[in-house]
């Protein structure tokens, strides 16, 4: 198969693994967009004497960063991880053409929406998100009601197409599942949270469609109802990637620990706890809104229930590692899974105080919150997704395994990425605890050192991720260049770690037996 044919097979996929690669490449593109936007907005934050004139550029970079992350990267990455979980469970994506159509159309439409340079924050609260006057423009380039309505309309359609992609994944998973067999733990989490995504993502489509009707049909927007509708999507979306990655950790960590999962029953029951919990705690994003006491108490209880599910995941995986004889951290996939788990513990611990009504005022709308969820992104999501990506590389080429040298450099890259970004996250959290508010371009000079440290550490850490990804890809492509075609393995890369000399002896002995016969 020529290089052009291979590219065509990803651009317009005809098999499960090609669909996975298509969505993976899409997610990496949006990761680049959100990363560039982040470094641009951080450039402004390193200066403590910003003119009000730079506010528009700062908030536009902030909004594009958020939209590219939450509305583009997250659904793409979730679909890639879930699709790969099906592949690893010997299930198939049947409707490859439809998945390609959903991918290309949704990305083009999201690009059109972002081309207007949105300037209102990723959660686009009313009334700012629907204003365009001498005081404020929700979009820097789309300043007329028609253009603003068009932007929200194409976003609605894009989100509907994304929802259709997850519905397709669910349908294809059950259509190809052998009767009487249950899904392995990776696919079980993938399918379960495809359902969560398919249920909650339409809330974003409805919210943006409401804005469209405001511009084209003069339908009034109720601020509180709109916010409630948005957060029914807005809270679960932060788990669209982490929860399928939980399935990946349940799948990989036992392999590299050399034993079965400590309790698969816990892992499977935990799906219900996490799935239901994530759709019931959205109100904790509305702590400063005039909510009744009963609802506030529900926020506390439901969030603790959700935290229990996360804690059970940590306990299950931790016991799997600690009761094993030896964990194979020298394999980059094993190393990535371990870093993801440790990062999730450290990032998750910070979140326990946030939903508590009596404590939240100390942290609400501060950089403490930013530090918490970015730690989760930089460790569990980025490192967890990198772990899956590396296994995708090995799975895509029959017989391929990373060399000892490339494995070493990928481990170095993972630590190189993780250590500085842990520092960034904790610097953000300390600044937030001291009173640094999020989304503010003008700030007291006392916080400038924190912003300088955060930007400096981020610049140090980024090459680590690039090193990990490029070394892995170079090693895989160097191997593939010696192969006539891309092919799917019949045996997992983990089980192929066999001494070559012993393998040759076995083959020779079998030939001898055949000759005697």
Swiss-Prot record:
GO terms for molecular function: cytochrome-c oxidase activity; heme binding; metal ion binding; oxidoreductase activity, acting on diphenols and related substances as donors, oxygen as acceptor. It comes from the Archaea. It is an enzyme of class 1 (oxidoreductase). GO terms for biological process: ATP synthesis coupled electron transport; electron transport coupled proton transport. Its EC number is 1.10.3.-. Cu cation binds at residues 235, 239, 284-285. Keywords: Cell membrane, Copper, Electron transport, Heme, Iron, Membrane, Metal-binding, Oxidoreductase, Respiratory chain, Transmembrane, Transmembrane helix, Transport. It catalyses: 2 a quinol + O2 = 2 a quinone + 2 H2O. CDD domains: Heme_Cu_Oxidase_I. Fe(II)-heme a binds at residues 65, 374. It is a multi-pass membrane protein. The chain crosses the membrane at residues 19-39, 64-84, 98-118, 150-170, 185-205, 226-246, 271-291, 303-323, 333-353, 369-389, 412-432, 460-480. Heme a3 binds at residue 372. PROSITE patterns: COX1, COX1_CUB. It is found in: Cell membrane. Belongs to the heme-copper respiratory oxidase family. PANTHER family: CYTOCHROME C OXIDASE SUBUNIT 1. NCBIfam families: quin_ox_SoxB (NF041075). This is Quinol oxidase subunit 1.
